[in-house]
Amino acid sequence: MFSSHLEAEKQCLLNCIEAIRKSGSVAPARYFLTTTTTTSEAGKTYYYARLVKEESVGKQTVRSLGRIGSGQHRAWERSIARRDAIVELEQQLKLLDELMQRQQERSHLVDRDFSEPEKD
């Protein structure tokens, strides 16, 4: 038997994950953002956002998202933030499941009478 508080926490984590998924698109794994700069002949520096996908070890696909702060850039920032939040919540969920399993397996150690026997 495990704590009802743990079961409630598990449900809370699952609800949070579901809410994040419903709030918008979630970036796939191995996608991240980088920035690059370009300097014009007049000396003005422009900053651009790039979306990078790691294909395999050492291989990357790069796609320009326009200037930093552009609509595409902000959309990917939010998408990656949602992914990172889901990954964190899933890790917490895994730890919680392990704790619940441990409680279930070791309940015989805790669910017994520890009181002193009555003296006559």
Segments (PLM) and residue ranges:
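Conserved glycine(s) in the ABC-transporter nucleotide-binding domain "signature"
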Residues: M1-D120
